[in-house]
Amino acid sequence: MLARNPLVEAMLNPQTYPEPTGKIELIQTHISFVFVTQNYVYKVKKPVNFGFLDFSTLEKRRANCEKELQLNRRLCPEIYLEVVPINQSKTLKIKGEGKTVEYALKMKRLPQECIMTQLLQEGKIDKKIIDQIAAIVAKFHSQAQTNSEISEFGSLRTVKTNWDENFTQTVKYINQTVPKADFEFMQTKINSFMDTNKALFESRISDKRIRDCHGDLHSGNIFVTDKICIFDAIEFNDRFRYSDVTADVAFLAMDLDYQKRTDLADYFIAQYIIYSKDTQLKQLLPFYKCYRAYVRGKVV
């Protein structure tokens, strides 16, 4: 099927690119084609509409490329380079002549062996690196945008809506992937926590802890080189980024727990609290770790 796609075929040809390159590797996800060249990565969005994301038109794909560039430059300005047009003349060419038929996000290529997930498996992540990540995330959150629209996503009403959606979408899997007793236990505990902590959720809003966060902060989205790069923030749906900062912290902590590095998870949380001075975060952490684990289980 891919061989019949003129765009994919062209992007696998070194002559399509503005700089010299050797063999090109294609990585395909359900929403993107990612072309890995010798020194760069070009990400092309597929023309799909899944409801929670809409890349169905060229203009929407361009706008989402621009938004992805803007959002990820907050944490990786040296990696996220530019949005480039793919033009059609006699052949398809990036930044070529003729009509623009597609857009790609151009990024600097980093070595895959520097992905944090792999380094964790190799035992190469220590507390010094975790401390650096905690400092970066705390500073990022302190500078991230917040306003009345964003703050609404931390309200008990919105948080409850998100949980209700989770339960509704997974009820059909009871006794298939989740035992009925576990499902009902989680539902009871989650609803009880929300019912008894209305003041806590309200104070998070008044303390301006609801921000335009990363939205997908796990070890698979962190490069650890001389400079740590947290990449791939969610651009296609603001709802997935606008949240209590605890949700970002909880995602990475949950991921470290999953990889049997609870020691690093605890250290990350402790250092984040020191850097952010957000002592209230501990009260919400189990709640949001459960949320992140539930969502990950839902989408896997």
Regions found by a protein language model. Give the residues of each.
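ATP-dependent phospho-/nucleotidyl transfer catalytic cores
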Residues: 52-56, 93-97, 105-219, 223-300
